[in-house]
């Protein structure tokens, strides 16, 4: 089996770069780890947000393409990005998101996790997972959110597929994830990574999604070294 160590980063598509920056740094309290350009489109920024050290598994990046139409997340796409926050931060985040008129969902449970959902300014579906493993991880103490409540990293991502099987096989056979259970039409896969350890696939029989603002561009996975990366690439 070709092992990876979970999610390395997730890249999504945004609209206005200033609006994106203000939301992820001032509302969610993430650190702007790096600002560079899209190497395939040098006229476009590439914005990286993460924890204090910019560790793999904490980084969400964006290509802000203002001219692009709004996307329609659906089958064949990643349809949600989840962050880990401490369990004691639940009321803080509910109050914060409501105060900022972000209309968070009521707290709901999935695979035993307590979660709230909301959207960023471009409509990207986000979740905060009140994760016991985050309770023992320090938060960034220089951000807009107090350290005790700060986002710790990426928890995982949700994919929508017509048939979860082929993607599930890839996760298990080539990327080192283990099948962790089923809840209705949702299937969970888990790695042993500290951050970015969860991929969930929902069986979705609706229309194919359309890329655009507010959708995920790609998910990158970690490999232990160059040799392991080459092995995975050959499979």
Label every model-predicted segment.
Residues 42, 57, 76-78, 152, ...:
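Short, solvent-exposed loop/turn segments at the edges of secondary structure
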Residues 41-42, 52-58, 194-195:
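Short, solvent-exposed loop/turn segments that connect beta-strands within catalytic domains
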Residues 148-234:
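Surface-exposed interaction/gating patches
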Residues 59, 64-72, 131-132, 141:
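Peripheral, non-catalytic segments flanking oxidoreductase cores
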Residues 26-32, 102, 172-180:
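Conserved acetyl-CoA-binding loop of GNAT-fold acetyltransferases
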Residues 1-8, 13-22, 33-36, 45, 54-56, 94-153, ...:
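Vicinal oxygen chelate
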Residues 31-36, 48-49, 67-69:
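Short secondary-structure capping/turn segments at boundaries of alpha-helices and beta-strands
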């Amino acid at each position: 089996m070709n092992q990876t160590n979970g999610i390395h980063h997730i890249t999504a598509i945004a609209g206005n770069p200033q609006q994106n920056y203000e939301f992820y740094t001032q509302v969610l309290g993430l650190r702007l780890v790096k600002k560079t350009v899209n190497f395939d489109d040098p006229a476009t920024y590439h914005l990286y947000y993460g924890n204090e050290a910019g560790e793999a598994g904490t980084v969400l990046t964006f290509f802000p393409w203002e001219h692009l139409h709004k996307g329609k997340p659906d089958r064949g796409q990643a349809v949600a990005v989840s962050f880990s926050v401490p369990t004691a931060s639940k009321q803080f985040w509910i109050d914060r998101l409501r105060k900022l008129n972000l209309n968070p969902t009521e707290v709901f449970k999935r695979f035993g996790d307590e979660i709230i959902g909301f959207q960023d300014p471009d409509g990207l579906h986000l979740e905060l997972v009140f994760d016991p493993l985050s309770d023992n991880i320090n938060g960034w103490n220089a951000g807009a959110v107090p350290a005790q409540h700060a986002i710790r990293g990426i928890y995982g991502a949700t994919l929508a597929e017509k048939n979860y099987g082929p993607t599930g096989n890839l996760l298990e056979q080539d990327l080192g994830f283990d099948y962790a259970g089923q809840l209705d039409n949702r299937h969970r896969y888990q790695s042993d990574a500290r951050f970015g350890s969860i991929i969930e696939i929902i069986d979705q029989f609706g229309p194919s999604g359309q890329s655009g603002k507010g959708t995920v561009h790609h998910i990158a996975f970690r490999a232990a070294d160059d040799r392991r990366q080459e092995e995975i690439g050959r499979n």
